[in-house]
């Protein structure tokens, strides 16, 4: 369990603050931006033998690199199978943190890690001052965040209609961006929570990476997770408590989530845009109501004048001319316009596009009908 706690803390900070106290061993960390703080306190009963300091010696406070301490507990699955006992001691004279792993078959691994003396790292927070509180098994919340993409940075937690707890992926709105990001949302009923004290419409947005780190530890230990929060912009406090350990995670929240939380859980937010309805698959009977004559006029206008074989208005940019015949035009080319090779006659397109939906009496069997009289009498 100690190794899992270190893995959970490694998702937040790059330095580990280790402090032996009279009431237990404290492991703390904070991220570089000071927006996330985590603390685990292992009670003396968690250890087979615990001594905070030798008689007449002051308590040591030290910090070490997270990567150095994480290398000792890198492979958790292997440690659970091979390690029987772990001994941790602080040597103030040599500034060394000694970690000994007593493995099976008498194998002993010793890690000497250098540390630095430091002041006590303590965040000021009070869960009792938060008006909203949720408590649920960590397994329930872990399954709720499972569908979210691993690259997602923030997630919004709020109370929707019917006192449903909603987890929704948060994306920053960009005015000059037309791309629509995929939105993932999970809803949990009130019956999934052991305690739910929050009013409808409240919502906070916090980092998902740190939240997943706490969930992975709490779920492996089969613990309940409590979430204490206030208005957006105020820190959210995540706590786990057991007879052998206490855990506190304090995460900063975004302060501009009021506009996103007003319609949290409302069905109108998830309705498709009206413009998208035009791209839906039409019903088979819709073809009978279409104005096929308008399509026929557009198609037969291109073949009405047999003298001027002009193709429909298709924008074709003139391609590069071949070098062997630059600027050469024969009389036949001037008398008859060039046609695109491989382009079928318009009559065949008409038969293909409209032959299956026209009545047999209106199928183009003979010559194409003339929709406009000849202009011979105007002379």
Swiss-Prot record:
Region of interest called Sufficient for interaction with ABL1, as start-end residue ranges on this chain: 255-379
Record-listed Phosphoserine modification sites: 261, 266, 317, 330, 363, 368, 375
Superkingdom in the source lineage: Eukaryota
Gene Ontology biological process: cellular response to ionizing radiation; DNA repair; DNA replication checkpoint signaling; mitotic intra-S DNA damage checkpoint signaling
Residues recorded as bearing Phosphotyrosine in the entry: 17
EC number: 3.1.11.2
Composition skew (Basic and acidic residues), residue ranges: 257-271
Keywords from the named record: DNA damage, Exonuclease, Hydrolase, Nuclease, Nucleus, Phosphoprotein
A GO MF label: double-stranded DNA 3'-5' DNA exonuclease activity
Function comment: Component of the 9-1-1 cell-cycle checkpoint response complex that plays a major role in DNA repair. The 9-1-1 complex is recruited to DNA lesion upon damage by the RAD17-replication factor C (RFC) clamp loader complex. Acts then as a sliding clamp platform on DNA for several proteins involved in long-patch base excision repair (LP-BER).
Identification of the protein by name: Cell cycle checkpoint control protein RAD9A
